[in-house]
């Protein structure tokens, strides 16, 4: 099932080495901005979710066989959660990428009895992605929404 998580964009600007794509007012400009926000707010995804950390390596851009997992986390039961981010629309091809990462973590990182599951977070989940994940019980889909609230600090009255 798709779950909605409402987030607020933080005010700090991050330097990234990506070209900006045209952005709607309700999405992050860069995947790294979404990643940084979620790393600081993993509880929005699931209570008890923590960033993976071991031997000085954390779960941000976690290396897996020459590629990188956007966020590797551990849930409240101690199981791994592989999180793949798409700043705009999530298409079905992301499923293969996520399954490859899940298989790598199962093979290289897990202890006996430890499970691995995946989460895809995108601004918009395509119908093809919904269909592709419909029989995969180990993958959850989330759509994110941004909101911005303004608070008057001082009025400029005459």
Task: Briefly describe each language-model feature range.
Residues 1-158:
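Charged, terminal alpha-helix-loop-beta segments
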């Amino acid at each position: 099932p798709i779950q909605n998580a409402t987030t607020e964009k933080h005010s700090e600007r991050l330097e990234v080495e990506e070209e900006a794509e045209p952005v709607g007012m309700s999405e992050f400009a860069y995947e790294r901005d979404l990643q940084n926000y979620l790393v600081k707010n993993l509880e929005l995804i699931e209570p008890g979710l923590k960033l993976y950390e071991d031997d000085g390596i954390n779960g941000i851009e976690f290396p897996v066989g020459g590629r990188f997992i956007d966020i590797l986390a551990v849930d409240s039961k101690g199981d791994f959660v592989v999180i793949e981010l798409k700043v705009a629309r999530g298409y079905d091809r992301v499923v293969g990428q996520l399954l490859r990462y899940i298989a790598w973590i199962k093979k290289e990182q897990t202890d006996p009895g430890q499970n691995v599951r995946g989460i895809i977070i995108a601004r918009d989940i395509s119908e093809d992605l919904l269909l592709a994940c419909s029989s995969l019980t180990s993958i959850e889909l989330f759509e994110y929404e941004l909101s911005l609230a303004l608070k008057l600090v001082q009025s400029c009255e005459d």
